[in-house]
Amino acid sequence: MSDTQDNAPVSAQGVDQKAAAGCPVAHDSVTAHGSESESPAIDSPSAVGGGRPRTNRDWWPNQLDLSVLSTNSAKVNPLGEDFSYAKEFAKLDVEALKRDITEVLTTSQDWWPADFGHYGGLMIRLSWHAAGTYRIHDGRGGAGDGGQRFAPLNSWPDNVNLDKARRLLWPVKQKYGQKISWADLLVLAGNVALESMGFKTFGFGFGREDVWEPEEIFWGPEDTWLGDERYVSEKEFSAGVGATEMGLIYVNPEGPRGNADPASAAHFIRETFRRMAMNDEETVALIAGGHTFGKTHGAGVADDHVGPEPEGAPLEAQGLGWMSSHASGVGADTISSGLEVTWTDRPTQWSNRFFEILFGYEWELTTSPGGAKQWVAKDAEAIIPDAYDSTKKHKPTMLTTDLSLRVDPAYERISRRFLENPDEFALAFAKAWYKLLHRDMGPVSRFLGPWVPQTQLWQDPVPAVDHELVGAADIAALKAKVLESGLTTTQLVSTAWASAASFRHTDKRGGANGARIRLEPQRSWEVNQPEQLATVLPALEEIQREFNAAGGAKISLADLIVLAGSAAVEKAARDAGVEVTVPFRPGRTDATQEQTDVDSFRVLEPRADAFRNYLRPGEKTQPEVLLVDRAYLLNLTAPEMTVLIGGLRALEANAGGSRHGVLTDRPGVLTNDFFTNLLASGARWKASESTEHAYEIRDVATDKVKWTASAVDLIFGSNSQLRALAEVYASEDAREKFVQDFVAAWTKVMELDRFDLA
């Protein structure tokens, strides 16, 4: 099989990467070549003799890939299921840890010498690049799991020689063991580096737990490093990616596609930083603040001297890559990006010199010793110190993307304000840096350690509990009130699901806590059925008011929405002949509109929610692929996904009143009818001639339509793995198991954002 096959795989990294590209699974309109290797830029392995064993993916490249739902299972975790990072971290002396990191920063090693005698610039880049992969549209990327240790991130061109930074930190990690995760250490190193060079940071939160295999993420359609097939026009690239080229964190520092045009570069800087949740002020602060320190490395031509990246390096390299044959290959002879730029004359001290130098000179285009396009100050004295020879000085230099901060009108206004107000710049950088490092960590309730600052708006704050929580008798009384309210099982279940299922385990956003289902923008999302919410929410608010007015314990609307849905599930199970109690743990609170950044929350609106049989109009990606993506964001296993689909179909929880997949004569009753009727003989399925993504099940004898369904429904009979799961729940002895498993999965979703229960 060639690497450029017509039937591109529906992979765990992407979808039909050729047509839809994105998700763990994939998005929108970029194209790909369907590389068969884990990393799009690494050739497929070959077996001895020229061939290689063929996998199921080779034989059936469009087969739905469920593997993403079982990554990082307990089987790959060497620490065991009982390990608690929070408990181990509690034993850590964080001040001693900081001292040890500082000692690493200021102790130059012969095998990889420190620029200017200080590894600060290197560690800032390490932390920035660990966190900077975060993207708002699906919450993937970021520093939250230490994924930079693994392919493909450990071998991205933009991460060249960061393997050395991690190796420098190994003695610290080795000393403290499991008290500090790699994920925390990778970003703490940059924070400590800033402080060691005189900068006052905004704060720091520990709590990132390591993974033991990389998260499957669609980084782009290209099969070469620095490829740019993601562009759909000169000024636009696919919405499903975060950077402008494969293997970059943001943009090409030489300019778009190597074109040294600062104005054009500004357009792409703005877009890539927006996709990382940064506005213009935060963008300027981050670029200028980060480039106050350290230097880039381009002592020679990389193609002539630099060896393979870590994942492609030989065994004896022991995980290190990019070995250089240029002179000594290290220190003054280092080749990383190919650019040779030192931004300020105080590269190991916090200062405002970046802006002073940026605006203090006119700039002309030149090339580095490595042949990369960069800029040098016109008619300037040599004021920039050499990183290794104290007798040498250099003229000021800048990157094309640095000049964007002066050329772009909006960036220039901010930059000049920072130039004239250094304290304002310092605070802006401190806050933006804190946001960069913590954007994918969720609410501050997940943070550990003594340096956590006050909650910021971008952390989706919810109030603290300020009332007595309901007990068992209160819960029983409230359930009775809900079931007497006239609201239907379908209304209660679908509202609770809508409230909870906005959660994304990728960046720990969304969920039922806060009751933001009643606030904008979630209240107006089509998938949440605003007209139904206009009936359900006032009825629940009235029950809440009456209960809270009685004195004693109180209940938040966030808790009541979940409790009401759970009461409906219990009733539906009872109607099916199964008695069950849905676990309920109070403690959610109600956020206000002022605590809710509308623009920030818009990215949580689902393009599809297969659990409600919802597909955004015009969506091009296969619905069944988006099902797996949604299940992944909800941190569900394949069995949990399966039982939830069957139960929610039985409960008529579809968006917009759709009847697709409601394969039962007893809607609203928690039966396994979805599975029994889906797998029943004596019927044939046919694509609808009138409705896109719809199918009809017809009686073989009469040809009459018995049911309608979506592609998501049919996949549970079509895909062999999902059919195996469906058969479990379609069996005659599965009635109680189905209900119990549904309740367990339902409760899991309702509590996905209850970090206080961990």
Swiss-Prot record:
Major enzyme class: oxidoreductase
Enzyme Commission number, as recorded: 1.11.1.21
Alphabetized Gene3D superfamilies for the sequence: 1.10.520.10, Peroxidase, domain 2 (1.10.420.10)
Protein name: Catalase-peroxidase
CC annotations in GO: cytosol
UniProt KW Transmembrane helix keyword: no
Cofactor(s), names only, from the UniProt record: heme b
Residue positions of the active site: H129
Per UniProt, location of the Tryptophyl-tyrosyl-methioninium (Trp-Tyr) (with M-276) cross-link in this chain: W128-Y250
One example of a Gene Ontology biological process annotation: cellular response to hydrogen peroxide
Reactions it catalyzes: H2O2 + AH2 = A + 2 H2O; 2 H2O2 = O2 + 2 H2O
Assigned protein family: Belongs to the peroxidase family. Peroxidase/catalase subfamily.
Marked site positions, Transition state stabilizer: R125
Textual note on the cofactor: Binds 1 heme b (iron(II)-protoporphyrin IX) group per dimer.
InterPro entries in UniProt: Catalase_peroxidase (IPR000763), Haem_peroxidase (IPR002016), Haem_peroxidase_sf (IPR010255), Peroxidases_AS (IPR019794), Peroxidases_heam-ligand_BS (IPR019793)
Post-translational modification: Formation of the three residue Trp-Tyr-Met cross-link is important for the catalase, but not the peroxidase activity of the enzyme.
Keyword Heme carried by entry: yes
Keyword annotations of the record: Heme, Hydrogen peroxide, Iron, Metal-binding, Oxidoreductase, Peroxidase
Residues annotated as binding heme b: H291
Cross-linked residues, Tryptophyl-tyrosyl-methioninium (Tyr-Met) (with W-128): Y250-M276
